[in-house]
Amino acid sequence: MNNNLKSRGIMLVMSSPSGGGKTTISQLLVNELQGEIIRSVSVTTREPRNEEVEGKDYFFVTEDEFHHLCNTNQMLEYAKVFGNYYGIPRRFVMDNINNGISILFSIDWQGAFKLIDIMSEHVVSVFILPPSMEELKRRLYNRSGESDMINQRLKEAAFEISHCYRYNYIIVNHNIEESVQQIKSIFIAEKLKTHRKMFLEQVVKSYYI
């Protein structure tokens, strides 16, 4: 055994209102932390779309197989969306965490709260705020340009933001690169926490006591 204190992975849960920047931040974060963090891969009953890869984009199963996974406690959480089931496979998450690989979840507050409730030991949650509602409105307008849709998205954003208080960390996304570095700092600090260190007692006794 060497004195490299290897850490378990974390479940990095990120939420933001539409236009808040979590999709772009997620992509950049995974690129910067290659080999340390991967995106969550869900199980689904829907048909694969063009170029989707089994095990990378989704795990594709039949409805009977999906129900079996749920009934045997192999799903962390699941939901039915537009007639298809989606769920987070327990084994995929835990195998990676126990091998020191972290999982990134880019989800809404409801999904975040479910994971916080059932996997609090492993979850690190970050809520990403826009600089202001005016700035969010500008981003949404640049994205779609439809006033009715923007007004609805702003209402949904206000509701989403009203749930930010339960998250471990809150950042304000003034600048994408700065936000990525802030979350990267959170990631590094959380991985250094004592309770995430594997074989800590053995390493300390072998090398320091």
UniProtKB/Swiss-Prot annotation:
Pfam family, one: Guanylate_kin
Top-level division of the source organism's lineage: Bacteria
InterPro entries: GK/Ca_channel_bsu, Guanylate_kin-like_dom, Guanylate_kinase, Guanylate_kinase_CS, P-loop_NTPase
Keyword Aminoacyl-tRNA synthetase among UniProt keywords: no
Catalytic reactions of this protein: GMP + ATP = GDP + ADP
Entry keyword annotation includes Ribonucleoprotein: no
Enzyme Commission number(s) from the entry: 2.7.4.8
Any one Gene Ontology cellular component term annotated for this protein: cytosol
Entry's Gene Ontology molecular function annotations: ATP binding; guanylate kinase activity
Guanylate kinase-like domain sequence ranges: 9-188
Compartment list: Cytoplasm
Keywords from the named record: ATP-binding, Cytoplasm, Kinase, Nucleotide-binding, Transferase
Binding site for ATP: 16-23
Family that this chain belongs to: Belongs to the guanylate kinase family.
Job description of the protein: Essential for recycling GMP and indirectly, cGMP.
Record's protein name: Guanylate kinase
Organism listed in the record: Ehrlichia ruminantium (strain Gardel)
Gene behind this protein: gmk
